[in-house]
From Swiss-Prot:
EC number: 2.7.1.24
Entries under InterPro entries matching the protein: Depp_CoAkinase, P-loop_NTPase
Role summary: Catalyzes the phosphorylation of the 3'-hydroxyl group of dephosphocoenzyme A to form coenzyme A.
UniProt KW Protein biosynthesis keyword: no
UniProt record similarity statement: Belongs to the CoaE family.
Chain's gene name: coaE
One Pfam short name: CoaE
Broad enzyme group: transferase
DPCK domain mapped to chain residues: 4-200
Chemical reaction(s) catalysed: 3'-dephospho-CoA + ATP = ADP + CoA + H(+)
Ranges in a coiled coil: none
Protein name, entry field: Dephospho-CoA kinase
Pathway of action: Cofactor biosynthesis; coenzyme A biosynthesis; CoA from (R)-pantothenate: step 5/5
Length: 206
């Protein structure tokens, strides 16, 4: 198993911008959200299981998952949410492990929005948190998704607190400023992670 740097941050923090900056440096990026979409693509066994359990109305005419309908169905129903998690989490974990094993860069960047909520930081060698103020999160998300302040506040209330994320962080990128300010932080951390990954590999060798 290679060296894993987990990247997390709340909604609107700029995780994608940071991940893209690492990708530009040749680092393999493994995105938990993308994998979560892949395991329920048309034709996937998990999608058939969801249709069998929740009904065919969960599948759109083009064969894709009706995500909003599914979210509404499980939102106020813990049992149904648990059923869905029990179905999807092992598949997501399996595909994540596969992608980590296939990675060719000195370390991998594992982007996990719910790293703290699901205690997944224990599976990483290093945790990088993209930190912004709650007000910045609100403004960016309202602008990006064209949603109300109240809607974003509900999402923030359901996520781990800023303090909880920072408590598990080994490294922090302050992303309250302009997006182009990230490049120097990423370059500095990249050099550090290359060193850590090299040490990790040498320790792993018998």
């Amino acid at each position: 198993m290679g060296y894993i740097v987990a990247l997390t941050g709340g909604i609107g923090s700029g995780k994608s911008t940071v991940a893209n900056a690492f990708a530009d440096l040749g680092i393999n990026v493994i995105d938990a959200d993308i994998i979560a979409r892949q395991v329920v693509e048309p034709g996937a066994p998990a999608l058939h299981a969801i249709a069998d359990h929740f009904g065919e109305n969960m599948i759109a005419a083009d064969g894709t998952l009706q995500r909003r309908a599914l979210r509404e169905r499980i939102f106020a129903n813990p049992e149904e949410k648990n059923w869905l998690n029990d179905l999807l989490h092992p598949l997501i974990q399996q595909e994540t492990q596969h992608q980590i094993q296939q990675a060719t860069s000195p370390y991998v960047l594992w982007v996990v929005p719910l790293l703290v909520e699901n205690s997944l930081y224990k599976k990483a060698n290093r945790v990088l948190v993209v930190d912004v103020s709650p007000e910045t999160q609100l403004k960016r998300t309202m602008q990006r998704d064209d949603v109300t302040r109240e809607h974003v506040e509900q999402i923030l209330a359901a996520q781990a607190t800023r303090e909880a994320r920072l408590a598990v962080a080994d490294d922090v990128i302050d992303n309250n400023g302009a997006p182009d300010a990230i490049a120097s932080d990423v370059a500095r951390l990249h050099a550090h992670y290359l060193q850590l990954a090299s040490q990790f590999v040498s320790q792993e060798k018998p």
